[in-house]
């Protein structure tokens, strides 16, 4: 049997991390078994579904590189199929037309609640032999079995049982002729030959209804696995107030897809004590029986730690392809300065996100208008004039511009003036970067370039001279 899973989001908003984790688990399970992964857009909610949301879901899936083998299928393009199946069920007697008014149903609901009963349809039209005109408005209900129970072996939670007496006669077609969500899902899983349904725990109560419809259609019943919810670090359900919850927001905030995937796979699944997983390792080791039943707590600090790891562990050339987008957001012209892959090597240890890297690299490519006020006040003082003049001359004399030779020039300046490296290094750092912090000074000066570094030292010397004149 070929394993076939699906990810079936509703396009009413962005792809959030809970949905992304569900997609990842479904994708990994299919890949682990050499199966296929289907993308299905469940857009039956015509009022809330938007093209923008569909695009956002696709963007998120593509950014995470969760490629699908089939689809995307759209439920709104399959209404003829759903209605054909409903008509077949009406003929076979597994569904029936219900003409009860909203007023009657509301009165029934209030009466049941007043008695402390669970609100449910009383089956009036199921047993009715009244004649109705063909054009009289009605819904179609599934004739749910009234005896026995539904039992399914959830691959994460174990056996789950529902009494059929607890289940309503579900509406499967509305008065406007449109099929309902729970019914469309059943027909889709049947037609697309889905073998394993991996989805959020909020769908557990839908499962017995869907199984009963599948059995009425004499269709195979897939295996189900319901993943627990994700909470914020305060124990409450993850929401916007916990920070970014959209996958693409994490992209915008400077996270790598590898970091988010690694974090999400461990958010409820484990393989021993291993924390870092390549995509290949995730596929190799993933198993549903290792997924936790308990809710997981989202920890942004842990995600940040993973992101920092991947910035430094992945090939700089690859990280640079993701950094490019952030550079563009900052409107930095990188034509004059180090290659982005070299920038990743320079700033990788200091920066935990690519956004932070893009925001702290401008001095490598563009001249700055003024020095950081605090750094200049502390380090661009008259006492720094001589170290800057000497190191400028030694840098000017370099014929082979390498980081090693830059280091020698700085060291030689300190030796000649008989001062510590800090007496040379700190004024030089502020002079060439405009700030008080940077990567190692030799590689920083080397990356900025000889001509630009010397010009900036001269600018710093002019700043010191002006400062002296004002005193």
Curated annotation (Swiss-Prot):
Cofactor, how bound (note): Binds 1 zinc ion per subunit.
Keywords in alphabetical order: Aminoacyl-tRNA synthetase, ATP-binding, Cytoplasm, Ligase, Metal-binding, Nucleotide-binding, Protein biosynthesis, Zinc
GO molecular function: ATP binding; glutamate-tRNA ligase activity; tRNA binding; zinc ion binding
EC number: 6.1.1.17
Motif 'HIGH' region, residue numbers: 9-19
Residues the entry annotates as binding Zn(2+): 98, 100, 125, 127
Cofactors: Zn(2+)
Motif ('KMSKS' region): 237-241
UniProt KW Methyltransferase keyword: no
Catalytic activity annotation: tRNA(Glu) + L-glutamate + ATP = L-glutamyl-tRNA(Glu) + AMP + diphosphate
Enzyme class: ligase
Locations listed in the record: Cytoplasm
Stated role: Catalyzes the attachment of glutamate to tRNA(Glu) in a two-step reaction: glutamate is first activated by ATP to form Glu-AMP and then transferred to the acceptor end of tRNA(Glu).
Entries under HAMAP family matching the protein: Glu_tRNA_synth_type1 (MF_00022)
Protein name: Glutamate--tRNA ligase
Provenance organism: Escherichia coli O6:K15:H31 (strain 536 / UPEC)
Organism ancestry: Bacteria, Pseudomonadati, Pseudomonadota, Gammaproteobacteria, Enterobacterales
